[in-house]
Amino acid sequence: MIQVIPSIAIRKGKVVKMRKGDPGSEKAYGENPIDLAKRFEDHGIKVVHLVDLDGAEAGAPKNYHVLEGIAGYTDLKVDFTGGVCTDGDISKAFECGADYITAASVAVTDPEQFASWIVSYGREKITLSADVSDPVSKTIAFRGWQRKSDKTLYDHLQFFNDRGLKYAKSTDVTRDGVLEGPNFEFYQDILDRFPDLKILASGGVRGVDDILRFQEMGIFAVIFGKAYYEGILNLKDLEQFAEKSAT
């Protein structure tokens, strides 16, 4: 069964969302991130995707305290991402309660470093974030999606697939936060090219039907955010999804 994972994006301690990765479009939601995580847990969620936006842009995590709070006050497994670029960063993230690490920028700027983490921490603990700001050229976006690499998605995935990668998250940034639906063809291409990778889809999810379609495609997990915060995908929807998936 597909995993359904809510995203909690943090800037300066607040829960926020953007449109297409544009900081100028940022909207803050009046949610305490720890209370929010607890609410997800109370409705059957097992894993949350915690995004340190300050860290992603700075190149070093800035919201370890939020990670510690969620890990300390819930039994959720936390997938932490945002600025994890050094051995010290990843070690501290795990010490603060992260169960998994998702990294993007270091895989672009120091691919051998990221590859070493797959070996050191185990492939179950490490996820590559391979996001694109242009679904045609498929060049990798990093540093909080504010910079573009000359690396292409498929070459990037192949490099780490050859080095033992098991999990890859990918976002078509043009669909993120706009509630226009996921780019299903984008993910189907990834699945076709990399059948051994477990793919986490993120960006554009509107509701249960999108999640079910991803499940039918063979996507490992779907990460959602904006649809929940805007009241389009609510906790009742998630319960409905669980019921549908069980039938």
Can you annotate each of these PLM segments?
Residues K12-G13, K20-G24, F94, A98-D176:
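Conserved anion-binding
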Residues Q3-S7, V47, D75-D79, D99-T102, ...:
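Structural preference for beta-strand elements that scaffold enzyme active sites
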Residues Q3-V4, G55-A71, C85-S91, S105-T127, ...:
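Active-site-adjacent beta->alpha loops and helix N-cap segments on the catalytic face
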